[in-house]
Amino acid sequence: MLTITLSKGRILKQTLPLLEQAGLIIAKQELNSRKLILDTNLTDVKVIIVRSTDVPVFVQHGATDMGIAGKDVLLEHGANNLFEVLDLGIAKCKLMVAAESKNRLKQNTLKVATKYVNSTKRYFQNKGQSCEIIKLYGAMELAPKVGLAHCIVDLVDTGNTLKANGLIPFEYIEKISSRLVVNVASFRTKNAQIKSWIQNIENSL
């Protein structure tokens, strides 16, 4: 038996066609059901759908064998006890520093609003920039407007939301996309089956 963890929401919509091309189909009635473990067209493969931030947790602890998670989640929560085996090239965006002007970034101690605390801390430490990180779970663009922060660190896709709120992306931190990850122990114990799936998914990219 092979178990795969997928993310809810936008990533799932882009993941399902990819998996179908690789030979794995989840029926609509399964997706719309209240079941926590979903059946697929293959009797030896089950799927679990969870919040994006929980995907690496399930895979790291061996609750599932494989998973598909955003690089932003892997950077933030760590990637211990799992292998990142494929960049799937879906749900693409960039993790960036944005502010109202370049001058706002010229501070002795920069106030940064973000939900990506660990990634932000690493980035500014590497730059040698002192910063105070203010963790927010949403409405990031509001922080500079109301004086809560000098800048934000967030995912940028088209940049339209930033522009609508008077923010400009100035500094690039990381390219983000969905990645296929595998539990280290599962890769040893189910090597042939997992390698076959990695190949199938790679061929469908």
Curated annotation (Swiss-Prot):
<dbReference type="InterPro" id="IPR001348">
    <property type="entry name" value="ATP_PRibTrfase_HisG"/>
</dbReference>
<comment type="similarity">
    <text>Belongs to the ATP phosphoribosyltransferase family. Short subfamily.</text>
</comment>
<dbReference type="GO" id="GO:0000105">
    <property type="term" value="P:L-histidine biosynthetic process"/>
</dbReference>
<dbReference type="GO" id="GO:0005524">
    <property type="term" value="F:ATP binding"/>
</dbReference>
<comment type="function">
    <text>Catalyzes the condensation of ATP and 5-phosphoribose 1-diphosphate to form N'-(5'-phosphoribosyl)-ATP (PR-ATP). Has a crucial role in the pathway because the rate of histidine biosynthesis seems to be controlled primarily by regulation of HisG enzymatic activity.</text>
</comment>
<keyword id="KW-0368">Histidine biosynthesis</keyword>
<protein>
    <recommendedName>
        <fullName>ATP phosphoribosyltransferase</fullName>
        <ecNumber>2.4.2.17</ecNumber>
    </recommendedName>
</protein>
<keyword id="KW-0547">Nucleotide-binding</keyword>
<keyword id="KW-0067">ATP-binding</keyword>
<keyword id="KW-0963">Cytoplasm</keyword>
<keyword id="KW-0328">Glycosyltransferase</keyword>
<comment type="pathway">
    <text>Amino-acid biosynthesis; L-histidine biosynthesis; L-histidine from 5-phospho-alpha-D-ribose 1-diphosphate: step 1/9.</text>
</comment>
<dbReference type="InterPro" id="IPR013820">
    <property type="entry name" value="ATP_PRibTrfase_cat"/>
</dbReference>
<dbReference type="GO" id="GO:0005737">
    <property type="term" value="C:cytoplasm"/>
</dbReference>
<comment type="subunit">
    <text>Heteromultimer composed of HisG and HisZ subunits.</text>
</comment>
<keyword id="KW-0028">Amino-acid biosynthesis</keyword>
<dbReference type="InterPro" id="IPR024893">
    <property type="entry name" value="ATP_PRibTrfase_HisG_short"/>
</dbReference>
<dbReference type="Pfam" id="PF01634">
    <property type="entry name" value="HisG"/>
</dbReference>
<keyword id="KW-0808">Transferase</keyword>
<dbReference type="InterPro" id="IPR018198">
    <property type="entry name" value="ATP_PRibTrfase_CS"/>
</dbReference>
<dbReference type="GO" id="GO:0003879">
    <property type="term" value="F:ATP phosphoribosyltransferase activity"/>
</dbReference>
